[in-house]
Amino acid sequence: MRHAAVAAALSALALVSPAAGQDAKPAPPPPPLQVREIGSLHVGGRVATVEGLPAREITFSPGAPPTRIDPNGQFPVEQMYAQYVKLQEPRARYPLLLWHGGGLTGVTWETTPDGRPGWQMFFLRAGHDVYVGDAMERGRSGWARFPEILPGEPVFRTMGEGWGLFRIGEQSGWNPDPARRVAFPEARFPVAHWDQFMKQGVPRWTTTDRQIQAAYDALVQTVCPCVVVVHSQGGNFGFTAALNAPDKIRALVAIEPSGAPPQAAEAARVKGIPHLVVWGDRIASDPFWTRVRQNIERWQDQIRAAGGGAETLDLPAEGIRGNSHMLMMDANSDEVASRVQRWMESKGLMRD
């Protein structure tokens, strides 16, 4: 009965075509989740020492006396944060870890810009315990002084940069005035809520991959065995985490990953870990994304040559058009998640 209820909930989450749903009554809301525990943790990191900086006085609150601040001393740095939700009766054999992309945080997985439940809720309803992480330097993980501790300086994404990069529309279709923006005609991203999406953006560094990887590896050692779902910049961190701990990761799902391990990486180490890579629309017509995909396919070929399994879910090849780089936020996000869920079921990752 419990399995039937889960199947019914997943069916309710799947999108129907507008034509099919015009005269249909709204689906009843799914039953409440039976949650055992909600919590969080920080993992990884080190203690850094800052020396030689001048002290100064700062007033922290209006009307309060100034406080003398000495910026020299020891600081915890390079840690990462993760929040978890554990179910009363999970169907999945292992917890599911959701890792975000560049310039973003775990908010990616929580709620879509137009207010729909995100993949965190989808996979909870599918029966997974879910961990949502903020990479080192992002969100609730925090960042450190720069350049004294973090090398380089942060990069900030403008509101318009992602319009073309994330394949919402041509870059020339971006305009600060929402009424003048032009998206692709088949776009599934909720374009009317682009400004809401951009509020998720946070500073990022291009010089901290080693530290980010170390924190993700610490998370894997703390909470796994597990299944990892990664997006964009998170792709290479997930691939590398599997290389670093092949005994801990049971499967890896990469949603439009933007990077992969180098040619010299030992793909045989992950031959026992099933891999799935998911691609949205308009990859072939975009030179940047064409090169990205070629690099990922090179890594998939290496895994297969080593005797492992590396599959691809090409949504346009399946007749699903219009998906952007932000698949988990597109109008058919539940449909895509359902396909990922079925793949995990086919790999024996759910209890019978």
Across the structure, where does each feature detected by a protein language model lie?
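Short beta-strand element of the alpha/beta-hydrolase
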Residues: A92-G102
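The feature captures the conserved acid-bearing segment of alpha/beta-hydrolase catalytic domains
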Residues: A254-L315
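Gly/Ala-rich beta-loop-alpha elbow adjacent to hydrolase catalytic centers
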Residues: V229-G238, A242
